[in-house]
Amino acid sequence: MSTWANLGLQDSASPLMEQLIFFHDHALLILVMITVLVGYLMVMLFFNSYVNRFLLHGQLIEMIWTILPAIILLFIAMPSLRLLYLLDEINEPSITLKSIGHQWYWSYEYSDFNDIEFDSYMIPTNELSNDGFRLLDVDNRIVLPMNSQIRILVTAADVIHSWTIPALGVKVDGTPGRLNQTNFFINRPGLFYGQCSEICGANHSFMPIVIESVPVNYFIKWISDKVNS
C-alpha cells in the first residue's frame, strides 16, 4: 500500500505491475536525458558570445532534429505497445471473481462456486480497530490464492465505477450494462489495498477494496468454510 511521503510507485505484487514499473523507469530515463540536453542547449544559447548573422539554414542539423525525435518516440512506443497487449491478454484462469460497483460499496461473487457472494463496505473510523487503516479497511475482504491466474469481471449497478488495485497493476472500469474483464497473477501473500478510481458521487472516497492473498491450501479451506456455513 502507499505510505506517507512515498514519491514512487507501490511495491509490485504481480508480474504485470513489475513490467509497468520497468516501463515507467525506461520512459522517465529518456525524459530526463531530453530535459538535460534541452536545458544545456538553452543555457549555452543565452550565455555564449558567438553570433552568425548569415546562418539562414542548416540541412544537416534539421535532418538530425527531425530523425532523432522519431527514433526516441519509437524507443518509447514499442515497449508501451507490448505492455498494452500484455495487459489485455486473458490467460486460462483458475478462478473467476465478479465485482459489482454500487453507490457506495462493492459486492463480489465467486463464479466457480455456488452461493459464495458478499458485500464489502468500508469500516467507519469509529468502528476501526487499532491496527486498521482509516478509509481503507473493509468488513469483508476478497480472499484469493497466490500463484494462480485470476480473472475478474467488473460491472456496476448504478453509475460508472472503477475497480483498482495499484500493487497488482489492475484498473478496470465498471459500467452499468457492460461486463469488462482482465486477469492478474498475485505472486506473494499479503494484503493489497485499492479504491474506486472513478468519481461516482458524494461518497466516492469511501468505497475501498482489500485483497487478502493466501496460499492455495488456505484458500481451499476458506472456500470450504464458506460453502458449509
Swiss-Prot record:
Subcellular location as annotated: Mitochondrion inner membrane
Catalysed reactions, semicolon-separated: 4 Fe(II)-[cytochrome c] + O2 + 8 H(+)(in) = 4 Fe(III)-[cytochrome c] + 2 H2O + 4 H(+)(out)
Binding site for Cu cation A2: 196, 198, 200, 204
Alphabetical keyword list: Copper, Electron transport, Magnesium, Membrane, Metal-binding, Mitochondrion, Mitochondrion inner membrane, Respiratory chain, Translocase, Transmembrane, Transmembrane helix, Transport
InterPro entries in the record: CcO_II (IPR045187), CcO_II-like_C (IPR002429), CcO_II_C (IPR034210), Copper_CuA (IPR001505), Cupredoxin (IPR008972), Cyt_c_oxidase_su2 (IPR014222), Cyt_c_oxidase_su2_TM_dom (IPR011759), Cyt_c_oxidase_su2_TM_sf (IPR036257)
Enzyme class: translocase
EC numbers on record: 7.1.1.9
Note on cofactor: Binds a dinuclear copper A center per subunit.
Binding of Mg(2+), residues: 198
GO biological process: ATP synthesis coupled electron transport
Any one cellular-component term (Gene Ontology): mitochondrial inner membrane
Transmembrane segments: 27-48, 63-82
Assembly: Component of the cytochrome c oxidase (complex IV, CIV), a multisubunit enzyme composed of a catalytic core of 3 subunits and several supernumerary subunits. The complex exists as a monomer or a dimer and forms supercomplexes (SCs) in the inner mitochondrial membrane with ubiquinol-cytochrome c oxidoreductase (cytochrome b-c1 complex, complex III, CIII).
PANTHER family noted in UniProt: CYTOCHROME C OXIDASE SUBUNIT 2, CYTOCHROME C OXIDASE, SUBUNIT II
Assigned protein family: Belongs to the cytochrome c oxidase subunit 2 family.
Descriptive protein name: Cytochrome c oxidase subunit 2
Protein's organism: Drosophila subobscura (Fruit fly)
Lineage, opening ranks: Eukaryota, Metazoa, Ecdysozoa, Arthropoda, Hexapoda
